[in-house]
Swiss-Prot record:
Catalysed reactions, as listed in the record: L-lysyl-[protein] + acetyl-CoA = N(6)-acetyl-L-lysyl-[protein] + CoA + H(+)
Similarity field: Belongs to the BLOC1S1 family.
Pfam families named among the record's database cross-references: GCN5L1 (PF06320)
Assembly: Component of the biogenesis of lysosome-related organelles complex 1 (BLOC-1) composed of BLOC1S1, BLOC1S2, BLOC1S3, BLOC1S4, BLOC1S5, BLOC1S6, DTNBP1/BLOC1S7 and SNAPIN/BLOC1S8. Octamer composed of one copy each BLOC1S1, BLOC1S2, BLOC1S3, BLOC1S4, BLOC1S5, BLOC1S6, DTNBP1/BLOC1S7 and SNAPIN/BLOC1S8. The BLOC-1 complex associates with the AP-3 protein complex and membrane protein cargos. Component of the BLOC-one-related complex (BORC) which is composed of BLOC1S1, BLOC1S2, BORCS5, BORCS6, BORCS7, BORCS8, KXD1 and SNAPIN.
Protein name from the UniProt record: Biogenesis of lysosome-related organelles complex 1 subunit 1
UniProt keyword Transcription, yes or no: no
UniProt GO molecular function: protein-lysine-acetyltransferase activity
Name of the gene this protein is made from: Bloc1s1
Keywords: Coiled coil, Cytoplasm, Lysosome, Membrane, Mitochondrion, Transferase
Length: 125
């Protein structure tokens, strides 16, 4: 009887150990599946973030190139406007010079006319 109880007890312990081992393996399998699912889920987010970062880097490079082109074009426009402004100033200088010459010529013409009329009046007829 004692040996039978001992055998039953050992059999129950073996069953419990096997059941516990089975549950441990199932728990490990479930934990592994959960871990893989979480990693996959996180990897999707990381992959999306990586793709977004690559797109942003490309856009930044494009923007830098366009900004450099815009700066160059703006510099050219500024140069053209400065040249145009200088040309307008020169035209204004020429116009002022022409007015000055015209005024001097009128003064000379008036003086010559005055002298000529004075000579005509003083000449004996």
């Amino acid at each position: 009887m004692l040996s039978r109880l001992l055998k039953e007890h050992q059999a129950k312990q073996n069953e419990r150990k096997e059941l516990q081992e089975k549950r441990r393996r199932e728990a490990i399998t479930a934990a592994t599946c959960l871990t893989e699912a979480l990693v996959d889920h996180l990897n999707v987010g990381v992959a999306q973030a990586y793709m977004n970062q690559r797109k942003l880097d490309h856009e930044v490079k494009t923007l830098q190139v366009q900004a450099a082109q815009f700066a160059k074009q703006t510099g050219q426009w500024i140069g053209m406007v400065e040249n145009f402004n200088q040309a307008l100033k020169e035209i204004g200088d020429v116009e002022n010079w022409a007015r000055s010459i015209e005024l001097d010529m009128r003064t000379i013409a008036t003086a010559l006319e005055y002298v000529y009329k004075g000579q005509l009046q003083s000449a004996p007829s």
